[in-house]
Amino acid sequence: MGSPRREPGRRANEQQRDVEFKRGFYMGVTEVSNAQFRKFKPEHRSGIVGNHTLDLDNQPVVAITWMEAALYCNWLSEQEGLPPAYEKKGETLVAVNPMTKGYRLPTDAEWEWVARYEGGGKLRRYPWGDSLPVTPRSGNYADETARLIVQDVIPDYDDGFAATAPVGKFPANNLGLQDLGGNVAEWVTDYYIVTADIGQTLVDPLGPTDGKQHVIRGASWKHSGVTDLRLSARDFGEGARNDVGFRIARYAD
């Protein structure tokens, strides 16, 4: 995980570290859609930006907190008779440790590995490859059609969507997953910290045991800069945003 110190656009929270996955896991091919989320919370509305709706059934759900995403995962586990992946701790939810086979958000490490995987021990820098410019129609980023609703756009890039696109609209990566680097950024399970356990191999890491904010992964329809477009970039937050959604994951055994 992480990026080299001299990589253009690198942030201080991207320290390189070794991770080992001993438990196999599944991950959603696409981000959770409004239609899927409204089966859990029928009244939810993802809103609008400018004159562009974010609320169509096939668009990714946004305007949700980390806790709402975690509650959706627990609800989905209940529908399938699986143990919950999150439990109450005071006024919040925390990941069960050791983690169950219930539905959950991907971990920070899982998300980055799946997003960057190229095979043969190689990890890609951007969703489309290792260099700029952005490959045409490779994902939904801040493009020319978004000039009226975002401050900065990618010059001469047009993905056809000013805001969110329908889930699964763009090409899949090497593992068959879509929109890991575009459309909406995504909540993951881990609490956010700047520093990492450098010098040791982390095995199936779930992140810190407590904190105030959670990690957000991936670029969104709002992003155009080299820092955010890279797959090693890490953001954080807790409250709802109109460019942050999520996808589901769970352990295979």
Predicted features, each with a name:
Residues 52-60:
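Short coil/turn segments at secondary-structure junctions
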Residues 1-48, 60-77, 182, 248:
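A short glycine-rich, aromatic-capped structural motif
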Residues 17-20, 52-53, 159-160:
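Short, flexible turn/loop "capping" segments at secondary-structure junctions
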Residues 16, 24, 213, 226, ...:
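Structural motif
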Residues 4, 24, 131, 221, ...:
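Short loop segments at secondary-structure junctions
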Residues 13-19, 210, 238-240:
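A generic structural micro-feature
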Residues 242-253:
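Short, structured beta-strand segments at or near domain termini in extracellular proteins/domains
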Residues 55, 66-234, 238:
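Functional-site microenvironments in short loops/helix caps that host divalent-cation chemistry
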